[in-house]
């Protein structure tokens, strides 16, 4: 089963993100746009794991969640990871309690490594992917100027989840396997 650890957002936040995604779509020649219901903050991509491994992962996440307080973040920037001929991933980024988020991320990394999962080598850049393989009609800086984050209120990360990713009817669907409340 293909999985990751993440934090989900409520419908209001997802709808606001979709509003920004709409601006991006209007100013793009091509791209793959994320389904609104799938907007999330990835804390750790696990990849393919065996069903029985979810029990140990769940126990670890429960212990981690009990030690970490809720995290307040602001969605207030747009950026991208570059691809060869296009933007590989267009994302929304955060400010706010990034130090607390970093501590949560590091503990998840260490605990998953202890369970035999691969450690991430790249620096963690917390973000929400809204599009992939994107080719814009306008320069990125012009797109950035069109995006307004004033309607976003502070997002509170209250829980973390082990999330299953599967393809259903040609569309990727994310389903929480287990969810743990932060203290």
Where are these regions (language model features)?
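Histidine-dependent nucleotide/RNA phosphoesterase domain, centered on the 2H-phosphoesterase fold
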Residues: 1-183
